[in-house]
């Protein structure tokens, strides 16, 4: 007798609640991650059928973040029924039930079901290819599904560190003797033995480092020694910041099997959009620079007095915003229990640990600090990560140098603190990705203590692209995420500072001097009138050449 779908899930350790609408499935106690509907259809399901199911399911998702839907259609389905996988609905046939009973099932979210099929299609045409997916969308589960489906063949799995390899092993869920897990660094330590490595499949996680380090050549040797093996690379950030090199083109023959960007993950509600707390940390220096600029400017006395009043008011109005403890007290919810702090290097870490701990303590938080970096060794770092993961009434604060940048999620993380500006957009997204997780079910907090008063945030840059995604067709009931929740003191402060800067802008100052000259002399300055005359002549020339801005 074939077990019921409920029994299949229970055997896998999933939490199941039966209802008229379908089965509510949870991978963790107290959470619902999916609604599964079993359908005994006589004809294959079509796109229209799937859209009707989506409309019904979407009303059930209220109050649940990142909930996905699965239809198990005993009568099969047409390929068009899979059109809504990015929106969170996938369709399966009876082979899905066979997988549940196989003892090697790896459950995938709908967006990863789409990615996995793309991998299978890609390998029908190419021996080597890559998948690019935003951090937190389940790349380790994609690799785990591939491993489980090829468990009888020899597989080599490479990743930057043991912790990432352990995450992949955990996602697989069962032991497979034909699979060999190796770090990139191990290829250097055992280079003489690398020629003995044989595989039918080579899987490379975080492939954007391929070729960037000394081990890149050793990994290339392994690939060349297995000239018939299928090679699959996974990364969230394939563009290397140095030289903006596209590693998909460079190392995977340009064969991009599937891509899911961070923008798509946000828009389609695959990842929760963090609450961005933009701090005014460092505002003192900014206001001091404005003060010096005012003193050096050629403003009229009247304008100087006007701008000085605005500066003085800004100092008074934002006095509370200058202190990091006040920002933390006001904007970091007390429900937050896991905070990641990223440091530039070990020296930076040693300086920031006491400072950040001081801020948190002054903000009224009881904390336990942890440090993870390469100087401690992998075993010690593993023990520290385990301790950080433990549940506690205290705020666990993990200070990291590089190690959590690459492909690793720590369960339960709900906040990230940015302390240093980075020139690498890629690193910024990787840091942001540490608190993004498709299974988290909650909205994380990003404390931005980088002094970015004069620049655009990642949110400012991405918002227009989200608007464009909203123009794509969607099923009834789908609501895409097209906006960000930005809070903190910064937006108001930035507006005030931009107003002051505008008043100190050289063109505006010279224009006012011109008006004053015209009023007093009832004439226009000639080129012999010094700086004002030269400036006025320059504007005339720019106007004649069509280069003067319209508003001027």
Could you tell me what each predicted segment is?
Residues 125-146:
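Walker A/P-loop
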Residues 256-340:
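Conserved interdomain linker/interface between the two RecA-like ATPase lobes of SF2 helicase motors
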Residues 368-401:
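Conserved helicase ATPase core of P-loop NTP-dependent helicases/translocases
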Residues 424-440:
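Conserved SF2 helicase motif VI
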